[in-house]
Amino acid sequence: MHYYAYVFIAAAALPGSTAFAQVSAGGDAAKGEQVFKQCMTCHRIGPDAKNLVGPALTGVIGRQSGTAPGFAYSTLNKAAGENGLVWSDDLIFQYLPDPNAFLKKFLTDKGKPELATGSTKMAFKLGDEQQRKDVIAYLNKFSDKK
C-alpha cells in the first residue's frame, strides 16, 4: 500500500475527523430503537431506566466511562474513565464493534498499558456500521447533549 493511503486511513480513524463527524448525522433514531432491542438484555434507557447487567444508558453521551450511579463497573471501564474517556458519538461508534479491544487501545494510547488488562462486562459486539450510527442516534434522544 502506498504511504499516502496509510496517512489517509490513519487520519480517517482519528476522533473528530470527517469520517467520525458523520456518525450522528448518518443515523436514524427510529431504526436505532429497533437495534437497541438487542441491547435490552443488559441495558435500559429512558427517564425511569435502572441498571441491569449493564448500566442504564440514559445520558451516556457526555458521561465519563465507568461512572453511571449505582453500577459496578469492571476495572477496565473505570480505568478508561479515570484516564479521560468521556463517551461521545464517535467514541461509542468505535467502542461497539469490540468493547474490550477499544478500552485496551484507549488506555495504551494514553500511556497506561499496565491498566489495559482484564475485560469489560460487555460481551456484545455491534459491527454493522449503519446499525451503530442508528443506535447512536437513538442514544442521543436520551442525552443532555445539544
Model-derived features: positions:
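Extracytoplasmic electron-transfer domains, predominantly the class I c-type cytochrome c fold
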Residues: A29-A30, Q34, N51-M122, V135, ...
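Cleavable N-terminal signal peptides
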Residues: F8-I9, A19
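Electrostatic cytochrome c docking/interface patches
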Residues: G16-F36, P47-D48, K146
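Short cysteine clusters
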Residues: C39-C42
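Bacterial N-terminal signal peptides that target proteins for export
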Residues: M1-V7
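Thiol-/selenol-based redox modules, centered on thioredoxin-like
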Residues: Q131-K146
